[in-house]
């Protein structure tokens, strides 16, 4: 039996654009994808912090260092520009792999620049000094 484990996460990124007429997906700054260990075209789950919407799409690599987070196609209806979103990617692992696994968690500032990268996910309240 395999487990589905959190592989990578970009926490509280700010939606910069929403393009309803694009074919689909989410465009993400390449630096953020790399820091979180998420590949271009990989499936991600997205949670909108402001409205609670939760949906899946795939990633498209955006310009490195741009801070771009753009929801495309139908996904653009799930968010508003300025909303905070959490992007999560999962991987299948054997029980042995799962026991040793630590996800890559990327915290960003309001410009979607990397503020901190950790290899753990723990319960707790976000504070300014945590990010």
From Swiss-Prot:
The pathway this protein participates in, as annotated, is: Cofactor biosynthesis; (R)-pantothenate biosynthesis; beta-alanine from L-aspartate: step 1/1
Write out the PTM section of this UniProt entry: Is synthesized initially as an inactive proenzyme, which is activated by self-cleavage at a specific serine bond to produce a beta-subunit with a hydroxyl group at its C-terminus and an alpha-subunit with a pyruvoyl group at its N-terminus.
InterPro entries under this entry? Asp_de-COase-like_dom_sf, Asp_decarbox
User: What processes does the entry annotate via GO biological process terms?
Assistant: alanine biosynthetic process; pantothenate biosynthetic process
Q: Which Gene3D superfamilies match?
A: 2.40.40.20
Q: Which residues bind substrate?
A: 57, 73-75
Q: What is this protein called?
A: Aspartate 1-decarboxylase
User: Could you name the active-site residues?
Assistant: 25, 58
Database matches in Pfam families? Asp_decarbox
User: Which source organism?
Assistant: Agathobacter rectalis (strain ATCC 33656 / DSM 3377 / JCM 17463 / KCTC 5835 / VPI 0990) (Eubacterium rectale)
Q: What does the record note about the cofactor?
A: Binds 1 pyruvoyl group covalently per subunit.
